[in-house]
């Protein structure tokens, strides 16, 4: 299957108080315009959707400038074989910030994930993603590199045992704001 789509989104963000950092209200109105393609179905080798567009967020406070940029989004799965799938993701959006003098952040993420079923009940997933955050109107740039490994053992339809490791390397051009973290989780999940 193959389909072309267009998407228009509007938002209104209202906050009860102004930001403590600079006294400006972060209330805003925003729009997102996207055009893209949707292709494939569950049984096909390649399936997913991709879009490109434009987004803007207009603060109600005249002391802050508009935040806008090109939006690129994708979620594409490629089934290499019955037990193995690669997934490519890309996301772009505008987020609020209370950073002094900035109305928002243009955030861009790109990632790759591999999923392999060793058996029907043993599945491993490895992923890596990079995020760049560009602050509007201030010289702050931040990036994040995230890698993860997940192993799942399905006991039955309801219970899953899992082990997960994730590392995050956060980098900022602001002194003292860079950090690295590792997270290990082991547990059981119940779904019904």
Task: Please describe what each predicted stretch is.
Residues 1-6, 43-50, 82-88, 120-126, ...:
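Repeated loop/turn-to-beta-strand initiation elements of outer-membrane beta-barrel proteins
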Residues 10-14, 41-43, 52-58, 90-96, ...:
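Transmembrane beta-strands of outer-membrane beta-barrel pores
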Residues 37, 46-49, 59-63, 68-101, ...:
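Alpha-helical scaffold segments of alpha-solenoid architecture
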Residues 151-154, 158-160, 164, 180-192:
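Outer-membrane beta-barrel "beta-signal"
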Residues 35-39, 74-78, 112-116, 149-153, ...:
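Residues on the lipid-exposed face of transmembrane beta-strands in outer-membrane beta-barrel proteins
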Residues 84-135, 142-144:
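C-terminal structural cap/anchor segments
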Residues 9-73:
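Acidic, glycine-rich loop-and-beta core segments that form the ion-binding/anion-interacting portion
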């Amino acid at each position: 299957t193959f389909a072309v789509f267009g998407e228009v989104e509007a938002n209104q963000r209202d906050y009860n108080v102004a930001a403590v950092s600079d006294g400006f209200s972060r209330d805003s109105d925003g729009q997102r315009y996207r055009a893209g393609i949707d292709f494939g179905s569950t049984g096909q080798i390649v399936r997913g959707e991709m879009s490109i567009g434009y987004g803007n967020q207009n603060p109600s406070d005249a002391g802050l400038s508009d935040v806008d940029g090109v939006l690129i989004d994708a979620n594409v799965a490629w089934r290499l074989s019955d037990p193995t799938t690669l997934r490519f993701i890309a996301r772009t959006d505008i987020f609020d910030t209370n950073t002094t003098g900035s109305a928002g952040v243009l955030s861009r993420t790109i990632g790759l994930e591999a999923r392999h079923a060793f058996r029907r009940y043993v599945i491993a997933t490895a992923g890596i993603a990079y995020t760049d955050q560009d602050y509007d109107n201030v010289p702050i740039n931040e990036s994040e590199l995230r890698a993860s490994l997940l192993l799942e053992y399905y006991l039955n339809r309801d219970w899953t045992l899992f082990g997960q490791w994730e590392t995050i390397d956060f980098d900022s051009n602001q002194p003292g704001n860079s950090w690295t973290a590792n997270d290990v989780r082991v547990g059981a999940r119940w779904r019904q």
